[in-house]
């Protein structure tokens, strides 16, 4: 396990992403604890729709680290990655005899944090 400098942790959040948090977590579990380069490769080649917003948030977190903290992207590791449930959009599907069934369209908030790996002495 790589030691991380959590004092220099930088994060990015995507809110109200129109996707189920369960499906996003399946992708986030694959990149948690990996280096930035590894995470990019994994996200590029995974066949899930959830990879697009996760990739966007990861790139944003690394850009924040580079611009705001002056950190090198090559040294960064995904220290935290989680998806919380957002509000569900409620829609109705007409059914027979004047009834209507509710359809829930879930949203989620994706958070990705990156931190520099500490050099081994």
UniProtKB/Swiss-Prot annotation:
PROSITE patterns: RIBOSOMAL_L22. Keywords: Ribonucleoprotein, Ribosomal protein, RNA-binding, rRNA-binding. The keyword rRNA-binding applies. GO terms for biological process: translation. Gene3D superfamilies: Ribosomal protein L22/L17. InterPro entries: Ribosomal_uL22 (IPR001063), Ribosomal_uL22_bac/chlpt-type (IPR005727), Ribosomal_uL22_bac/org-type (IPR047867), Ribosomal_uL22_CS (IPR018260), Ribosomal_uL22_sf (IPR036394). One of its GO terms (molecular function) is rRNA binding. One of its GO terms (cellular component) is cytosolic large ribosomal subunit. Transmembrane segments: none annotated. This protein binds specifically to 23S rRNA; its binding is stimulated by other ribosomal proteins, e.g. L4, L17, and L20. It is important during the early stages of 50S assembly. It makes multiple contacts with different domains of the 23S rRNA in the assembled 50S subunit and ribosome. The globular domain of the protein is located near the polypeptide exit tunnel on the outside of the subunit, while an extended beta-hairpin is found that lines the wall of the exit tunnel in the center of the 70S ribosome. Part of the 50S ribosomal subunit. Belongs to the universal ribosomal protein uL22 family. This is Large ribosomal subunit protein uL22.
């Amino acid at each position: 396990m790589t030691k991380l400098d959590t004092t220099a942790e930088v994060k990015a959040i995507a809110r109200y992403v129109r996707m189920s948090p369960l499906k996003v977590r399946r992708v986030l579990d694959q990149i948690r604890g990996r280096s930035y380069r590894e995470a990019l490769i994994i996200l590029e080649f995974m066949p899930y729709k959830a990879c697009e917003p996760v990739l966007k948030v990861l790139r944003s977190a690394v850009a924040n680290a580079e611009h705001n903290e002056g950190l090198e992207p090559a040294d960064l590791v995904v220290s935290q990655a989680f998806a919380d449930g957002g509000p569900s959009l409620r829609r109705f599907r007409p059914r027979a005899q004047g009834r209507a069934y509710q359809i829930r369209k879930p949203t989620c908030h994706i958070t990705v944090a990156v931190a520099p790996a500490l050099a081994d002495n």
